[in-house]
Swiss-Prot record:
<dbReference type="GO" id="GO:0140664">
    <property type="term" value="F:ATP-dependent DNA damage sensor activity"/>
</dbReference>
<feature type="binding site">
    <location>
        <begin position="67"/>
        <end position="74"/>
    </location>
    <ligand>
        <name>ATP</name>
    </ligand>
</feature>
<dbReference type="Pfam" id="PF21096">
    <property type="entry name" value="RecA_C"/>
</dbReference>
<keyword id="KW-0547">Nucleotide-binding</keyword>
<dbReference type="InterPro" id="IPR013765">
    <property type="entry name" value="DNA_recomb/repair_RecA"/>
</dbReference>
<dbReference type="GO" id="GO:0009432">
    <property type="term" value="P:SOS response"/>
</dbReference>
<dbReference type="GO" id="GO:0003684">
    <property type="term" value="F:damaged DNA binding"/>
</dbReference>
<dbReference type="GO" id="GO:0003697">
    <property type="term" value="F:single-stranded DNA binding"/>
</dbReference>
<comment type="similarity">
    <text>Belongs to the RecA family.</text>
</comment>
<dbReference type="GO" id="GO:0005524">
    <property type="term" value="F:ATP binding"/>
</dbReference>
<comment type="function">
    <text>Can catalyze the hydrolysis of ATP in the presence of single-stranded DNA, the ATP-dependent uptake of single-stranded DNA by duplex DNA, and the ATP-dependent hybridization of homologous single-stranded DNAs. It interacts with LexA causing its activation and leading to its autocatalytic cleavage.</text>
</comment>
<dbReference type="InterPro" id="IPR020588">
    <property type="entry name" value="RecA_ATP-bd"/>
</dbReference>
<dbReference type="InterPro" id="IPR020587">
    <property type="entry name" value="RecA_monomer-monomer_interface"/>
</dbReference>
<keyword id="KW-0234">DNA repair</keyword>
<keyword id="KW-0963">Cytoplasm</keyword>
<keyword id="KW-0238">DNA-binding</keyword>
<protein>
    <recommendedName>
        <fullName>Protein RecA</fullName>
    </recommendedName>
</protein>
Length: 352
């Protein structure tokens, strides 16, 4: 078949498909603008936003946050909700664990008066509510807390001790098949919080796994593994927070397996000032000599906590350091592009 004939045959096939399934059912990827634009919601931790590679969690996708107990899963999800609201968006929280603290959510920055919350009786109801909210197209982010608490209706109606093999996994697989396309069409972000369990009889490799079967692992565009790695001491040697380490276990939108660390303080959630300090020291924007932190010719303070308080007071300095960090990250990406351009010029010159 000649090239003109193939072109006419393709045009006829496209015309028939659009007639059969509607306009826009098939198109060139380059002309599909939404394929290039990924809108995101910030996580509240600049180090995690940079590790994700796209500046936050993506809208129109499924995100899984998993980790052990008291590792900051709900805190991270609530920060994402708060940031979505600050952008003028609408957020919904499906509290299957019946454990969301409104006072703590408000302390983090969530507008609890505008935050929609549902506490369904069974897993099918929770996932149906999430699908209906996403289908409305009016919700920016939906948090499901947690997958482990999504109890299938038949298990709820049965007796304690009854065996229900694979029931939750089948429920999740069926729901995610419907939910994925709806989220992409309405540009809604769904965040599933998940717990970890240990496989029995595993001698080699990682014995940890997440609940709900394999479907969520496949359908998630981003999987965030969050762990507590230490405590933060305050006055009189009391714990005032936790040091958190996050690993991007899966990422369909940027290189995976990047890590980030940040602080979660009990009285404010994720410490954005702490993230700025860590990144600024790492990028040599802030000079750390002993216990003193210096920025240009200015002494910021002695000790990390003193600098944190200074950045919380001085928002102008906070945003200046944040801008310097972004500029440093962008500058570090330039040499790779420059090398490609130089190589292209060499190839072009050799061809001459």
């Amino acid at each position: 078949m000649s090239v003109p004939d193939r072109k006419r045959a393709l045009e006829a096939a496209i015309a028939y498909i659009e007639k059969q399934f509607g306009a826009g059912s098939i198109m060139s990827l380059g002309k599909h603008s939404s394929a290039h634009e990924i809108s995101t919601i910030k996580t509240g931790a600049l180090s995690l936003d940079l590790a994700l590679g796209i500046g936050g969690v993506p809208k129109g996708r499924i995100v899984e946050i998993f980790g052990p107990e008291s590792s900051g899963k709900t805190t991270l999800a609530t920060h994402i909700v708060a940031n979505a609201q600050k952008m003028g968006g609408v957020a919904a929280y499906i509290d299957a664990e019946h454990a969301l603290d409104p006072n703590y959510a408000a302390l983090i920055g969530a507008n609890i008066n505008d935050l929609m919350i549902s506490q369904p009786d069974c897993g099918e109801d929770a996932l149906s509510i999430a699908e209906l909210l996403a289908r409305s197209g009016a919700v920016d982010v939906i948090v499901i807390d947690s997958v482990a608490a999504l109890v299938p209706k038949s298990e709820l109606e049965g007796e304690i001790g009854d065996v229900h093999v694979g029931l939750q996994a089948r429920m999740m697989s069926q729901a995610l098949r419907k939910l994925t396309a709806t989220l992409a069409r309405t540009n809604t972000c769904a965040i599933f919080i998940n717990q970890i369990r240990e496989k029995i009889g595993v001698s080699f490799g990682n014995p940890e796994t997440t609940t709900g079967g394999r479907a969520l692992k496949f359908y998630s565009s981003i999987r965030i593994d969050i762990r507590r790695i230490g405590s933060i001491k305050g006055g009189e040697n009391f714990d005032i927070g936790n040091r958190i380490k996050v690993k991007v276990a899966k990422n369909k939108l940027a290189p995976p397996f990047r890590t980030a660390e940040f602080d979660i303080l009990f009285n404010e959630g994720i410490s954005s000032a702490g993230c700025i300090i860590d990144l600024a020291v790492e990028k040599n924007i802030i000079d750390k000599k002993g216990s003193w932190f210096n920025y240009q010719d200015r002494k910021l303070g002695q000790g990390r906590e003193a600098v944190r308080e200074e950045l919380k007071r001085n928002k102008e300095l906070f945003h200046e350091l944040e801008r310097c960090i972004y500029e440093s990250v962008q500058a570090s990406q330039v040499p790779a592009a420059a090398c490609v351009d130089a190589e292209s010029r060499q190839v072009a010159e050799a061809a001459k």
